[in-house]
Amino acid sequence: SVGSVYMPDGKTFWAQPFAIGDELGGQKANPQQMAAIQPMPDDSKFGGMSPGANTTIGIIATSAKLTPAECKRVAMMAHDGFARAIRPVHTPSDGDTIFCISGGTKEITDGPRRSRELGEIGAAGADCMARAIARGVYEAQS
């Protein structure tokens, strides 16, 4: 993705509000800094990039028994995790993609409640995606 996983201070993750404990180092955002944040990086970051040149790929795996259409919905919802962790995201230079796979070992409710349960899976997927992106960067070693 063209965007950054860090706030402008270079050490606070965009996904910090979704962290559990100190998994991302415990760095907290400065509210005054948040008010002054520019959403797009400077122009030099975009020079000569072709569409899809900065692709972020992810996968959501669930044990819930989902249809292909439901997997697609969960993957769509998980894109919120990209937006929570990377700023900006889904620019014309990005080819961001998320897949969802269903292990099919756990039945979820049929009928009207199924939609709610599917929403819960997608929302949890988005939270996990945000945390996974930030943790991947935080835990990476060069």
Regions found by a protein language model. Give the residues of each.
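A structural signal for small-residue-enriched, beta-sheet-centric alpha/beta enzyme cores
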Residues: S1-S142
